[in-house]
């Protein structure tokens, strides 16, 4: 359940859906496994996984939701070879060239015949709805997966006025300034990894890892006009992260010491531990968002 990435969105209007109403809305779009002829299925599932019993898990007016996606695995090469074999057979028997429309229809038939025997894979994406911040945090490094979750949530609720998080000043401008100064605003602490990009169309990209970012070798790239687009940070003693210029957070990791705060909770009750972990994670992510917005100079004014 501990989030590992953050794709960030904000509401244009206050989110005022209560837990019970949210649960009811999601219930019409619950996940069900693929049938023999389904290519994929997508829907809401228990927020706390197999041990959970509800689509929404809430604490302190913070709501955790989860979507599950199942996809049939049909390798393109398998389809291509089957199609070529079938086309060659028909063209040889009928002594003619098949039209593109016929080949497309034949391809659909082949896919239909292969689906019942295809393996499938499942993936899950969680999101945290934070009415107090008017934000949604999606635990995904993929903007596409985040948008899929939001699209289904929008369908369930009827509307979902959200936009990607954006700041008054470009994130890369702030990251570049921090690197020049040799430190990030408290409670953030700069680590030993960064990615710098030239603003020129065909400019270069330089990556530093396990290196002192205050060294002249690093700062020299700033003098040539490069800007920082990725920067590794620590948030206090609780979270390590990689902040990117698109305002997304990658490689989010809660420290063992921080997570150990719940070690004595739920030793005999796994649900109690999950509930405690969610409350702990939620409160720290709220603190992280407050600090991040302040460090980056505030959010851009929302367009209603």
Curated annotation (Swiss-Prot):
Pfam families: RdgC. Its main location: cytoplasm. Keywords: Cytoplasm, DNA recombination. May be involved in recombination. It comes from Shewanella baltica (strain OS155 / ATCC BAA-1091). This is Recombination-associated protein RdgC. Belongs to the RdgC family. It is found in: Cytoplasm, Nucleoid. InterPro entries: RdgC (IPR007476). GO terms for biological process: DNA recombination; regulation of DNA recombination. GO terms for cellular component: bacterial nucleoid; cytoplasm.
């Amino acid at each position: 359940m501990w989030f590992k990435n953050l794709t960030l969105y904000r509401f244009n209007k206050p989110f005022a859906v209560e837990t019970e109403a949210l649960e009811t809305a999601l219930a019409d779009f619950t996940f069900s496994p693929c049938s023999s002829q389904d290519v994929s299925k997508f829907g809401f599932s228990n927020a706390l996984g197999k041990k959970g019993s509800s689509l929404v898990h809430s604490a302190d007016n913070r709501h955790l939701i989860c979507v599950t996606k199942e996809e049939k695995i049909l390798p393109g090469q398998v389809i291509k070879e089957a199609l070529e074999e079938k086309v060659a057979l028909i063209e040889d028997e009928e002594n003619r060239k098949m039209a593109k429309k016929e080949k497309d229809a034949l391809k659909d038939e082949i896919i239909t015949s292969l689906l019942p025997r295809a393996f499938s894979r499942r993936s899950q994406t969680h999101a945290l709805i934070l009415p107090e911040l008017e934000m949604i945090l999606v635990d995904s490094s993929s903007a596409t997966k985040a948008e899929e979750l939001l699209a289904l949530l929008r369908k369930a609720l009827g509307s979902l006025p959200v936009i990607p998080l954006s700041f008054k000043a470009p994130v890369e401008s702030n990251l570049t300034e921090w690197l020049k100064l040799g430190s990030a605003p408290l409670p953030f602490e700069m680590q030993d990894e960064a990615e710098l990009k030239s603003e020129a169309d065909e400019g270069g990209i330089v990556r530093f890892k396990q290196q002192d970012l205050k060294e002249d070798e690093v700062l020299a790239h700033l003098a040539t006009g490069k800007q920082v687009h990725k920067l590794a940070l620590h948030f206090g003693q609780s979270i390590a992260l990689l902040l990117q210029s698109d305002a997304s957070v990658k490689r989010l990791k809660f420290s063992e010491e921080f997570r150990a705060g719940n070690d004595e909770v739920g030793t005999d009750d796994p649900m109690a531990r999950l509930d405690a972990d969610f409350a702990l994670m939620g409160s720290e992510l709220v603190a992280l968002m407050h600090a991040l917005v302040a460090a980056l100079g505030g959010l851009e004014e929302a367009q209603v």
